[in-house]
């Protein structure tokens, strides 16, 4: 089975209630936890939609902005991310190096770029620090021609995500007179399961979507040993979780869904945090079981502006208050858009023909089942650092 996880987050910069958390997380995990909190905000307005984000990508783009911020703008970013401007560089540089390491065996690429208006002068320390931390190059584009600028940026995105994401930026988001910078982060992931699914075990089964409607969708199936467990939310709602490691074993997929089919996925999501996911990793036990998982493709573009404002990052969006003096001292800048687009594809390796509906998981004496036939939560975790590369909910495969 192949998993392709290209991801892109874009911040366009133009002219002119923070939650509490136990201090039990490593610095590497703090950025991902911020992304999970953003995810929780998004889900509030999209409880029945497919949502895919990258917490690590959110941490990266906020880290890039933090390096250019000053005053209260920097303070808000530091408070929500929970490490200072010096810490952000050290931590994210360490995480990125670990994530793209060839030791992982799975393919992970992380790319960053700053696109600036022709003739726009970026402060040398900002450009140098971004290059050191994020391997980020500054590229000039002609924002006076929005269509041309979009083509250049979209081409970069398509190339860095191996063709999986294109047409992200549209000309109407570019102000030909005012747009000065576009910051971009792209993450691409491709992994093979440690325990692979066989195409002959795939058949259509019923999946009950978030809207209550039933759909017949192709379901992957296998009998193997998986680490799994169950726990309950503070208000007593039980849910189950399972780990599917990739063949390099440094990256895993975790799936969680309510134990009772009558419990909506939205009821357990507010309970999810980096600390929660860490507890799953520490309490799961290996069991031989039958796993049934839907094949699916999900594409989602999300505006992160309101979720970030809900967490307390507000000033960088306000023309009269934003302070990005470390990017440039010649003009006043503020963030006009912060967008994220992610695509996830789940497919069997090399399978192009019609699915063979061979049923082999019927025997009454078979091991316990873990059936994912209703809305579920998934995350892709880099285990050595605890970084969450991708996080999403699937309401309809």
From Swiss-Prot:
Q: Where in the cell is it found?
A: Secreted, Extracellular space
Which residues does this entry assign to the site Reactive bond?
Answer: 364-365
Chief location category: secreted
What residue range is the signal peptide? 1-19
> Which is one Pfam family of this protein?
Serpin
Q: Which positions are glycosylated?
A: 159
Q: Name one GO cellular component term.
A: platelet alpha granule
Q: Which GO terms describe its biological process?
A: blood coagulation; cell differentiation; cerebellar granular layer morphogenesis; dense core granule biogenesis; detection of mechanical stimulus involved in sensory perception; embryo implantation; innervation; long-term synaptic potentiation
Do the record's keywords include Lyase?
no
Database matches in PANTHER family: GLIA-DERIVED NEXIN, SERINE PROTEASE INHIBITOR, SERPIN
Explain the purpose of this protein: Serine protease inhibitor with activity toward thrombin, trypsin, and urokinase. Promotes neurite extension by inhibiting thrombin. Binds heparin.
What is the protein named? Glia-derived nexin
Source organism: Rattus norvegicus
């Amino acid at each position: 089975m192949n998993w392709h996880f290209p991801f892109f987050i874009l911040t366009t910069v133009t002219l002119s209630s923070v939650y509490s958390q136990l201090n039990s997380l490593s610095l590497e995990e703090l950025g991902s936890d911020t992304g999970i909190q953003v995810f929780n905000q998004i889900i509030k307005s999209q409880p029945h939609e497919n949502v895919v984000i990258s917490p690590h990508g959110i941490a990266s783009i906020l880290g890039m902005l933090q390096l250019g911020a000053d005053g209260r703008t920097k303070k808000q970013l530091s408070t929500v991310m929970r490490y200072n401007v010096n810490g952000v560089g050290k931590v994210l540089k360490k995480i990125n190096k670990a994530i793209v390491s060839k030791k992982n065996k799975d393919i992970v690429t992380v790319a960053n770029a700053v696109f600036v208006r022709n003739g726009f002068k970026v402060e040398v320390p900002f450009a140098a620090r971004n290059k050191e931390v994020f391997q980020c190059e500054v590229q000039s584009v002609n924002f006076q021609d929005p269509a041309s600028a979009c083509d250049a940026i979209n081409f970069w995105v398509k190339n860095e995500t191996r063709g999986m994401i294109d047409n992200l930026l549209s000309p109407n988001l570019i102000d030909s007179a005012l747009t000065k910078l576009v910051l971009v982060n792209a993450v691409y992931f491709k992994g093979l399961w440690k325990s692979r699914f066989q195409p002959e075990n795939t058949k259509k089964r019923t999946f009950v979507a978030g809207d209550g409607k039933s759909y017949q969708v192709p379901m992957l199936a296998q009998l193997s040993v998986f680490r799994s467990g169950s726990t309950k939310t503070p208000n007593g709602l039980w849910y189950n979780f399972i780990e599917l490691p990739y063949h390099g074993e440094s990256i895993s997929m975790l799936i969680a869904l309510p134990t009772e089919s009558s419990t909506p996925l939205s009821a357990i999501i507010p309970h999810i945090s980096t600390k929660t996911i860490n507890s799953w990793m520490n309490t799961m036990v290996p069991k031989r079981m039958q796993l049934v998982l839907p094949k699916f493709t999900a594409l989602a573009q999300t505006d992160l502006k309101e979720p970030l404002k809900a967490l307390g990052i507000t000033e960088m969006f306000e023309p009269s208050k934003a302070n990005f003096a470390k990017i440039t001292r010649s003009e006043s800048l503020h963030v006009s858009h912060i967008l994220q687009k992610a695509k996830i594809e789940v497919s069997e390796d090399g399978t192009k023909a019609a699915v063979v509906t061979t049923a082999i998981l019927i025997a009454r004496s078979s091991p316990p089942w873990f059936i994912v036939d209703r809305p579920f939560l998934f995350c892709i975790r880099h285990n050595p650092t605890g970084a969450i590369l991708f996080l999403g909910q699937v309401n309809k495969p």
